[in-house]
């Protein structure tokens, strides 16, 4: 497969065309961003860690019936993925209250929620990725119909039901995570983007030590060490 011109560059990845019009190469970057890219940094090797972590998680999800865009991983930082039309919604699944949820609703940080909360944000950096509801999704034509909203929520909850016990077995608490979904040329909804410490909050099961991008957001240090620890636990 031939890697051709760059199609898109985001905060954490670059997408390249290939000689197959239905496939792209996704390259993971070492860049770190927070607060809608107002805070920026770089951690050598982070891209490779996220690529490995996301590959392992996507394979786990596929074995459990979740369709993804991943075709194969071809280098330390590169994946071949199906070309998708990304649904312009960030889907957030929360198991424990922290971050923006505590600020918006006054819930005490660390509160275990009675059930997984699924939230939507509009994918629009200029607007600050605002929170939106089902009706917004329909009014803005972000989805095809109400049935697709239900499909998105059901997929998000199923992913959570697979990952929460998996990570618990690795002595990690899956606090919350963000996913992006895409539509293939056959209009099939698939998990796209990545699942990694860039897009998840992981706390150690016993100490509640943060092992994710919050270490960068909150200037806790040892970002790479935390990502390495997550990968180590996934592989063990």
From Swiss-Prot:
PROSITE patterns: SAICAR_SYNTHETASE_1. Its EC number is 6.3.2.6. Pfam families: SAICAR_synt (PF01259). One of its GO terms (biological process) is 'de novo' IMP biosynthetic process. It comes from the Bacteria. It catalyses: 5-amino-1-(5-phospho-D-ribosyl)imidazole-4-carboxylate + L-aspartate + ATP = (2S)-2-[5-amino-1-(5-phospho-beta-D-ribosyl)imidazole-4-carboxamido]succinate + ADP + phosphate + 2 H(+). One of its GO terms (molecular function) is phosphoribosylaminoimidazolesuccinocarboxamide synthase activity. Keywords: ATP-binding, Ligase, Nucleotide-binding, Purine biosynthesis. Pathway: Purine metabolism; IMP biosynthesis via de novo pathway; 5-amino-1-(5-phospho-D-ribosyl)imidazole-4-carboxamide from 5-amino-1-(5-phospho-D-ribosyl)imidazole-4-carboxylate: step 1/2. Belongs to the SAICAR synthetase family. PANTHER family: MULTIFUNCTIONAL PROTEIN ADE2, SI:DKEY-6E2.2. This is Phosphoribosylaminoimidazole-succinocarboxamide synthase. The gene is purC.
């Amino acid at each position: 497969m031939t890697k051709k011109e760059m199609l898109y560059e985001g905060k954490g990845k670059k997408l390249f065309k290939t000689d197959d019009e239905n496939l792209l190469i996704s390259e993971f970057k070492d860049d770190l961003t927070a607060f809608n890219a107002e805070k920026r940094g770089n951690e050598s090797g982070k891209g490779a860690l996220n690529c490995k972590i996301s590959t392992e998680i996507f394979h786990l999800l596929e074995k459990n019936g979740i369709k993804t865009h991943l075709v194969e991983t071809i280098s330390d930082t590169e994946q071949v993925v199906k070309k998708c039309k990304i649904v312009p919604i960030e889907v957030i699944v929360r198991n424990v209250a922290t971050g923006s949820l505590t600020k918006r609703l006054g819930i005490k940080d660390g509160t275990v929620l009675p059930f997984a909360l699924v939230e939507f944000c509009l994918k629009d950096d200029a607007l600050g990725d605002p929170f939106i509801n089902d009706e917004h999704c329909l009014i803005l034509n972000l989805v095809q119909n109400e049935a697709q909203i239900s499909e998105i929520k059901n997929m998000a909850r199923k992913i959570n039901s697979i990952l929460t016990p998996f990570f618990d077995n690795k002595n990690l608490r899956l606090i919350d995570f963000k996913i992006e979904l895409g539509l293939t040329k056959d209009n099939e909804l698939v998990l796209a983007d990545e699942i990694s410490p860039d897009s998840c909050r992981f706390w150690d099961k016993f100490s509640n030590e943060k092992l994710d991008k919050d270490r960068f957001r909150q200037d806790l240090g040892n970002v790479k060490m935390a990502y390495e620890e997550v990968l180590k636990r996934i592989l063990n």
